[in-house]
Curated annotation (Swiss-Prot):
Organism: Delftia acidovorans (strain DSM 14801 / SPH-1)
Keyword flag Nucleotide-binding: yes
A biological process term (GO) from this entry: glutamyl-tRNA aminoacylation
Protein name: Glutamate--tRNA ligase
Catalysed reaction, written as an equation: tRNA(Glu) + L-glutamate + ATP = L-glutamyl-tRNA(Glu) + AMP + diphosphate
Highest taxon of source: Bacteria
Lineage: Bacteria, Pseudomonadati, Pseudomonadota, Betaproteobacteria, Burkholderiales
Keyword Transmembrane applies: no
Enzyme Commission numbers on file: 6.1.1.17
Keywords, ordered alphabetically: Aminoacyl-tRNA synthetase, ATP-binding, Cytoplasm, Ligase, Nucleotide-binding, Protein biosynthesis
Family label: Belongs to the class-I aminoacyl-tRNA synthetase family. Glutamate--tRNA ligase type 1 subfamily.
Length: 468
């Protein structure tokens, strides 16, 4: 029987979660969903000084917005300390762990000597017990660290689902500290115990963890646990070509939500930052899950491009049903200060969305257009105003306003009125349409003027044509 896939996302709650982080949640989530497996959320909060509940909340909020649901968790490492110490005691009993009394000062001096000799700085095994070896006398009043006995000789290797075969010489690995003098276990040990206890089958994470992997494989083997399949994802770079991080300006995932991006568009864009399905650039969440596998993970770093993200979002926005889009844009319209009673007074919102969605990249863009149909005061583009609303077209605007006051209210009737005024005034379409657009919506660039005016309504058109 094939083992059920179990993946995990294990962030440290030391700040907000950015796009580089969330991609490391997206792929294991997608792999679990694509294979009928389980996705586990684990919070690695052993850095007590920097970890905060507020950061945990932001992580969960960002994942919830992107609809990256977890089947188990969140589990907190700080709540599992008794379990770690229990497993650690077992490793001590089996001879895989030993106490090391080397002081920080002694370690520093050792490293300085090694570097002076152009050697790789590393622990030299002074306190490692071996047959026939006499250990130094145990110093009084010193609490030891616990070190893991790394196998000597040979290699440790794995077939990485993203990078191919990776191997390390065991001789390059020193004996890892897995418990501090106060008894608290260290990161690499906790991770292995968690993955063992949670039966994780696939570890899909950033390639900054590659150097941890040989050590973790040794710990898994010492525990008698199954070694999971590893996939180390290439780095996500920012627009300047640097590794994306909080320190160099990366935005929180939730900020993209507030800027009007759609969760499915974000999933689409992030999926393409390290995975591909042929030349397909735009796809739904369902298609992504149908297509996703670990065989098509890329090996080179993906570079974030906000212009491309906006384009992807625009494609998803256009594809949305008008009624669904109206519900999504509603809170963004209300954030502009518009009274909800005005928005709910009629059923124009889905039709306005239908008319303008092809011109928008985000829900914030669309909300800006929607607002113009309900407010009394709004800004006009000064350059468009000077260019198009001139004394030459004033008679045509007056004639058009007179016609609007009494015309039958339909898009077709308004279109007929425009043609009638053009003919009577001897003008071409842009000479009337452009100033009407500027006066009624503040810009010369709008969809079809008859469609816009039909939705704007007689009263607002007359007031705006008069105010010139």
């Amino acid at each position: 029987m094939t083992q059920k896939v179990r993946t995990r996302f294990a962030p440290s709650p030391t700040g907000f979660i950015h796009l580089g982080n969330i991609r490391s949640a997206l792929y294991p989530w997608a792999f679990a969903r694509a294979t009928g497996g389980d996705f586990i959320l684990r919070i690695e909060d052993t850095d007590v000084e920097r970890s905060t509940q507020a950061s945990v909340d932001v992580i969960i909020e960002g994942m919830a917005w992107l609809q990256l649901d977890h089947d188990e968790g969140p589990f907190y490492q700080m709540q599992r300390m008794d379990r770690y110490k229990e497993v650690l005691a077992g490793l001590q009993a089996s001879g895989h762990v030993y106490p090391c009394y080397m002081s920080v000062e002694e370690l520093d001096a050792l490293r300085e000597r090694q570097m002076a000799n152009k050697e790789k700085p590393r622990y030299d095994g002074t306190w490692r017990p071996e047959e026939g070896k006499v250990l130094p006398p145990v110093p009084e009043g010193v609490r030891p660290v616990l070190r893991f006995k790394t196998p000597q000789g040979g290699v440790v290797a794995w077939e990485d689902k993203c990078k191919g075969r990776i191997e390390f010489q065991n001789s390059e690995l020193d004996d890892l500290v897995i418990a501090r003098p106060d008894g608290t276990p260290t990161y690499n040990f906790c991770v292995c115990v968690d993955d063992m206890d949670m039966a994780i089958t696939h570890v899909i994470r950033g390639d900054d963890h590659v150097n941890n992997t040989p050590r973790q494989i040794h710990i898994f083997e010492a525990l008698g646990a199954s070694v999971p399949v590893f996939a180390h994802l290439p780095t996500v770079l920012n627009e300047q070509g640097e590794k994306m991080s909080k320190r160099n300006g990366a935005k929180a995932v939730t900020q993209y939500r507030d800027e009007g991006y759609l969760p499915d568009a974000m999933v689409n864009y992030l999926a393409r930052l390290g995975w591909s399905h042929g030349d397909d650039e735009i796809f739904s969440r369902a298609q992504f899950l149908e297509w996703f596998n670990l065989d098509h993970l890329g090996r080179s770093a993906g570079q974030f491009d906000e212009a491309k993200l906006r384009w992807v979002n625009a494609q998803h926005l256009k594809a949305l049903d008008d009624a669904a889009l109206a519900e999504l844009v509603r809170p963004f319209v209300l954030k502009t200060g518009l009274d909800q009673a005005l928005l709910d007074a009629d059923d124009r919102l889905p039709r306005i969305c239908a008319l303008f969605k092809d011109r928008c990249e985000t829900l914030v863009d669309l909300a800006g257009w929607v607002r113009l149909f309900y407010v009394d005061a709004f800004d006009r583009n000064a350059e468009d105003l000077a260019k198009h609303v001139t004394d030459v077209v004033a008679p045509a605007l007056d004639a058009f306003a007179e016609g609007i006051a009494s015309v039958e209210w339909s898009k077709e009737a308004i279109a007929a009125l425009i043609k009638e005024v053009l003919k009577a005034q001897g003008l071409k379409m842009p000479q009337l349409a452009m100033p009407v657009r500027v006066l009624t919506l503040g810009t010369a660039h709008t969809p079809s003027v008859d469609a816009v005016l039909e939705l704007l309504g007689r009263e607002k058109i007359l007031a705006r044509l008069k105010n010139r």
